[in-house]
Amino acid sequence: MSPLQEIGTAVRMTAIFWIGCGLAYPLIFTGFAQVAFPDQANGSLVRNAQNQVIGSSLIGQKFTSERYFHGRPSSIDYKAEASGASQLAPTNKVLIERVKADAAAFEAQNGTKPTIDLVTTPGSGLDPHITPAGAAVQTARVSRARNLAPEQVRKLVSQYTEGRFLGIFGEPRVNVLALNLALDGIRR
């Protein structure tokens, strides 16, 4: 085979793989995802009554009002395009001081110690969930701020607690955005 034939073969194979792997494969699977899982394929967006996007059920948001449950802290300030952890070791003084400060602020606002998930950042920096225990320690503050009976708020937390995936994987969790939207929907 001459060098020119080898170059021709290489160019043809490159074109075939580029079309197959670079165009056909992504288009087929994107199309499949749009048909089979349209909500997830489009980011699991959450919309309000006016059909405006107010968040995603997969990305945490910062809630600071006493009327809302607060999620996990984010090392990236909840910026989805910058997903990632702080990469600080557990013995890092900066991390230790931040956790202590967050715990003190939480205790001052809630009158109780936080659960570990409320003062540690997730690996992605975007976790939309907290533990049921993390929600429970915020229940008194939220019910007081909204003038709701604590039992009513606890019931809502229980209602929005998701179980383990397939009953065995992961831990029970509460989606903070979904819970806060449900709180906003309560009529007094």
Swiss-Prot record:
Any one GO cellular component localisation term in the record: plasma membrane
The source's superkingdom equals Bacteria
| Primary location class | membrane
**Pfam families given for it?**
KdpC
Give the UniProt subcellular location, in the record's own words: Cell inner membrane
Protein keywords: ATP-binding, Cell inner membrane, Cell membrane, Ion transport, Membrane, Nucleotide-binding, Potassium, Potassium transport, Transmembrane, Transmembrane helix, Transport
Q: How does it sit in the bilayer?
A: Single-pass membrane protein
Any one GO biological process: potassium ion transmembrane transport
Recall the GO molecular function terms of this protein's record. ATP binding; P-type potassium transmembrane transporter activity
Write out the transmembrane intervals. 13-33
Family, according to the entry, reads as follows:
Belongs to the KdpC family.
Assembly and partners?
Answer: The system is composed of three essential subunits: KdpA, KdpB and KdpC.
Role played: Part of the high-affinity ATP-driven potassium transport (or Kdp) system, which catalyzes the hydrolysis of ATP coupled with the electrogenic transport of potassium into the cytoplasm. This subunit acts as a catalytic chaperone that increases the ATP-binding affinity of the ATP-hydrolyzing subunit KdpB by the formation of a transient KdpB/KdpC/ATP ternary complex.
Q: What is this protein called?
A: Potassium-transporting ATPase KdpC subunit
The species this protein belongs to is Gloeobacter violaceus (strain ATCC 29082 / PCC 7421)
